Amino acid sequence: MLKQMTVNSIIQYIEENLESKFINIDCLVLYSGFSRRYLQISFKEYVGMPIGTYIRVRRASRAAALLRLTRLTIIEISAKLFYDSQQTFTREFKKIFGYTPRQYRMIPFWSFKGLLGRREINCEYLQPRICYLKERNIIGQCFNFRDLVFYSGIDSKCRLGKLYDSLKKNTAITVSNRIPFHDKTNDIIARTVVWDRNKHFSDSEIKVDKGLYAYFFFNDTYDQYVHHMYNIYYNSLPIYNLNKRDGYDVEVIKRRNDNTIDCHYFLPIYCDDMEFYNEMQVYHNNIVKPEMSVTLGLPKS
């Protein structure tokens, strides 16, 4: 129990300080009061990798998110995450992800290969099912939100509050999000559209593109929604080597009588060859061929 509490505390400390100061094992020894050896053994036992590797890849993964979701310059991101120079940042980033920071920002899809999200002890990450959705033209009510760390900050909770207000009036809602949706600031902007077939109450019209989607399902309390969405992006996608395609996603959120929600989440993924299906078969045999359409009771557009 003591080891587990120590590792959880170390993980929390790392997350809170990635953009506050340079972190290494010496910082953690000073923070925790435990020896280097004890921390290394305990961390490796529960997380499966050395502390130094975890810090290095988490820092690069935060940089990857900032490259894709903000307009901060490479120099600004390098300084924000306490790399000693832009050259060091570029070299380290390419070693981990196979792209330079500039290349990573410019590729037409969001690559999650090699990314590492915040690890949680004894956590089982959601497994995707690959499916195909047809193109849909959608009308609905639109709002934007911004957050410097995707699905983890105050603004994401404000978005959650708006969705909850809609859900209180209905047993189920369908929403689509486009991430990122940039404005002229450097903040992460996302556009959320709550589907509504009533044109009098709708202020936006969007298109959900046809193509492959990674389908995730979870049932939990509403408070855990943000937690699940973070893990889908920063843990499930890297584990299953999936890349995010630009475009609107689809969420079907259903309210249950036990104060929990069912969330059916369809995330657009990028795939340029059919070998992808063979790779996914390694993880599960529940794949849906692209000629099939998954509806799950989605409201008609």
UniProtKB/Swiss-Prot annotation:
A single GO cellular-component term on record? cytosol
What InterPro entries does the annotation carry? GyrI-like (IPR029442), Homeodomain-like_sf (IPR009057), HTH_AraC (IPR018060), HTH_AraC-typ_CS (IPR018062), MarA-like (IPR050959), Reg_factor_effector_dom_sf (IPR011256), Tscrpt_reg_AraC-type_HTH (IPR020449)
Q: Which residues bind DNA?
A: 26-47, 74-97
The GO annotation for biological process reads: regulation of DNA-templated transcription
Domain HTH araC/xylS-type intervals: 8-107
Q: Name one GO molecular function term.
A: sequence-specific DNA binding
**Keywords from the named record:** Activator, DNA-binding, Plasmid, Transcription, Transcription regulation
Q: What does this protein do?
A: Positive regulator of F1 operon expression.
- The protein depicted here goes by the name F1 operon positive regulatory protein
Tell me the organism's taxonomic lineage: Bacteria, Pseudomonadati, Pseudomonadota, Gammaproteobacteria, Enterobacterales
Q: Gene for this protein? A: caf1R
